[in-house]
Amino acid sequence: MPTDHFDLTDRVAVVTGGSRGLGREMVLAFAEHGADVVIASRKLDNCEALAAEVDERFGRRALAVECHVGHWEQVDRLADAAYDEFGRVDILVNNAGMSPLYDSLASVTEALYDKVMDVNLKGVFRLSVVIGERMKADGRGSIVNVSSVAAVRPTPGEVVYAMAKAGVNNLTSSLAKALGPEVRVNCLMPGPFLTDIAQAWDLEAFAETARRTMPLERGGRPHEIVGAALYLASDASSFTTGSVLKVDGGLA
């Protein structure tokens, strides 16, 4: 076994929601461990800035792609762009997501419901199938979905999001069976991480809640997703598929 269990030299990783937050951390970690990366999000300028950083810091190739994963035609274009540029994809991370706020369950419109489902579940299904089938034909690949502890510990303020993320957990198990043995499919289930999104939180109230409800008594630091992501993306997890790995400070 190689000294670096997380070695990704010359592999190609596609990361949706890759320009910020946990996605950004994973992009940088994959590049640091030798991978070329495809950075996808709705904000092309952010993707391009991170692609330039990857090249400057690690000397790896990085392709920026604008993509709204809730629209299948854009998902298909993302897959085609990755294969046109690199000829293959070894790692897919379905990280893009959204959890909009609402005043009450009755205030959730059909448009909002569909938007949350489209981004958090429908797009994950489509991109996993489009790239996963090509991975299977190529004889290898690793898909890493990103759900949330909301899937198993929902709150009233995120019901639709929790439904979608529970679907991602189920989809992970289903795709592991459908795409194996060539392709492994696993899932990260993060708890609360102090990414840029956390700037909108009442951090004092969150800190108090964390002390009461989480064994580690704090939110996650963005870089703390990296170890789990590298494990599932790399050959270190070669006998792991269909698994959901909590990275939540013990919350769930």
Give residue ranges: language-model regions.
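The beta1-alpha1 cofactor-binding region of Rossmann-like NAD(H)/NADP(H)-dependent oxidoreductases
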Residues: L44, E66-L78, E110, H223-E224
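Substrate-binding pocket helix/loop in short-chain dehydrogenase/reductase
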Residues: D103-L105, T109-K115, I143, A198, ...
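Active-site helix of classical SDR
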Residues: S128, A164, T172
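Residue(s) in the substrate-gating loop at a strand-loop-helix junction
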Residues: S148
